[in-house]
């Protein structure tokens, strides 16, 4: 090869190698991320802090936001337009929450794990409720009180019914995410398309197979839940 061409190829190889190393370093940092959202205020930490479930069982936040819209027909009758609030989940006034807070109900946490923002339930889902001083008064949130309106069995049934629906696919989720204007970078979009949605579906159906004992029990109803049987089913 002419000397000039050989020199050009050498520099091109160096540039390509440098770009590959930068890309590898970026992916290594991204995929090693494990950072839960935390709060200095202990009450906020109780309501929205992580108890660890968002790492192994967390659902990508954009999927969480899209599910009650994409599968609204499985929400409780007459409450199809309420989203997660249809199950008694409590939402606070966004004006009273910190800047940059990702909208979600009390009792849910956020964790960036493997580069994807995930959300899952925490203790406050069962241990926070609201009280009105009068019928026309605004509800006041009290942490630590029983969540007397939450219907976790209906929530569980919704999640399972959604996972069994033929629209639980990357194409349908990504289309709904785009319609809602949710932020999703190209890498996470590719991850959801190739594996993320399928992984969430498989995990839901695996958990559902362990919760089949609930089919033989009376419906728990709002404010009641079989606390320890699901935990035993998951851990055994």
Task: Tell me the role of every PLM-derived stretch.
Residues 2-21:
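N-terminal Sec-pathway targeting helices
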Residues 10-16, 43, 62, 69, ...:
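Extended aliphatic helical segments
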Residues 84-236:
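Extracytoplasmic redox metalloprotein regions
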């Amino acid at each position: 090869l002419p000397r000039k061409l050989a020199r050009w190829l050498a520099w091109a190889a160096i540039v390509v190698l440098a770009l590959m190393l930068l890309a590898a370093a970026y992916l290594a940092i991204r995929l090693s991320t494990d950072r839960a959202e935390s709060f200095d205020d202990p009450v906020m930490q109780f309501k929205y802090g992580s108890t660890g479930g968002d790492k192994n069982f967390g659902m990508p936040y954009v999927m969480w936001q899209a599910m009650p819209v994409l599968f609204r027909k499985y929400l409780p009758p007459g409450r199809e337009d309420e989203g997660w609030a249809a199950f008694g989940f409590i939402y606070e006034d966004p004006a009273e929450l910190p800047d940059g807070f990702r909208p979600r109900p009390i009792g849910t946490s956020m964790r960036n794990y493997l580069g994807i923002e995930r959300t899952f339930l925490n203790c406050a889902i069962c241990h926070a409720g609201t009280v009105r001083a009068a019928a026309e008064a605004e509800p006041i949130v009290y942490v630590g009180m029983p969540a007397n309106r939450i219907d976790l069995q209906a929530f569980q049934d919704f999640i399972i019914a959604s996972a069994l629906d033929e629209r639980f696919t990357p194409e349908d989720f990504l289309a709904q995410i785009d319609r809602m204007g949710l932020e999703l970078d190209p890498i996470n979009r590719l991850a959801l398309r190739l594996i993320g949605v399928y992984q969430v579906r498989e995990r839901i159906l695996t958990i559902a197979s362990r919760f089949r004992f609930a089919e033989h029990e009376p419906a728990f109803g709002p404010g009641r839940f079989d606390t320890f049987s699901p935990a035993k089913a998951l851990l055994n």
